[in-house]
Curated annotation (Swiss-Prot):
EC top class named in words: translocase
Enzyme Commission number, as recorded: 7.1.1.-
Organism per entry: Rubrobacter xylanophilus (strain DSM 9941 / JCM 11954 / NBRC 16129 / PRD-1)
InterPro entries found in the cross-reference section: NADH_UbQ_OxRdtase_chain4L/K, NUOK/Mnh_C1-like
Segments traversing the membrane: 14-34, 39-59, 76-96
Record membrane topology: Multi-pass membrane protein
Protein name as catalogued: NADH-quinone oxidoreductase subunit K
One GO location term (cellular component): NADH dehydrogenase complex
The protein's role, per its UniProt record: NDH-1 shuttles electrons from NADH, via FMN and iron-sulfur (Fe-S) centers, to quinones in the respiratory chain. The immediate electron acceptor for the enzyme in this species is believed to be a menaquinone. Couples the redox reaction to proton translocation (for every two electrons transferred, four hydrogen ions are translocated across the cytoplasmic membrane), and thus conserves the redox energy in a proton gradient.
GO biological process, alphabetically ordered: ATP synthesis coupled electron transport
Keyword rRNA-binding: no
NCBIfam families given in the database record: PRK05715.1-2
Catalytic activity as recorded in UniProt: a quinone + NADH + 5 H(+)(in) = a quinol + NAD(+) + 4 H(+)(out)
Cell compartments where the protein resides: Cell membrane
Length: 112
């Protein structure tokens, strides 16, 4: 397994991983700023979080002495993101039940 990882590292440099992560983050940020549907905005935020996870794992893999710390932090971030999505989608569902819309522009008041 270690030999396979070393072969992949020889083929794909750190800049390749960082470029993919930057593109993922940019797409997520663009979608979160442009789209008005709350569910799509949540998906874009998750894409941004996964771009950060990719960066963290790439640096942990390429830096000597990092060990499995990058993967450990990534698992923690994924667990926190799952909880964030559960709470966020519950809020969106509650808003949809009262307002009959998930459009962010139409839900601008905190009153019921």
């Amino acid at each position: 397994m270690q030999q396979l990882v070393e072969q992949l590292n020889a083929q794909i440099p750190l800049e390749g991983y960082l470029t993919v992560a930057a593109i993922m983050f940019a797409i997520g940020a663009w979608g979160a700023l442009i789209r008005r549907n709350a569910v799509v905005v949540f998906m874009c935020v998750e894409l941004m979080i996964n771009a950060v996870n990719l960066t963290l794992v790439a640096f942990a893999d390429f830096l000597p002495g990092a060990g499995g710390a990058g993967a450990g932090y990534t698992v923690l971030i994924i667990a926190i993101a799952a909880a964030e999505v559960a709470v966020g989608l519950a809020i969106v569902l509650a808003i949809f039940r009262t307002r009959r819309t998930v459009n962010i522009d139409e839900v601008d008041s905190l009153r019921g």
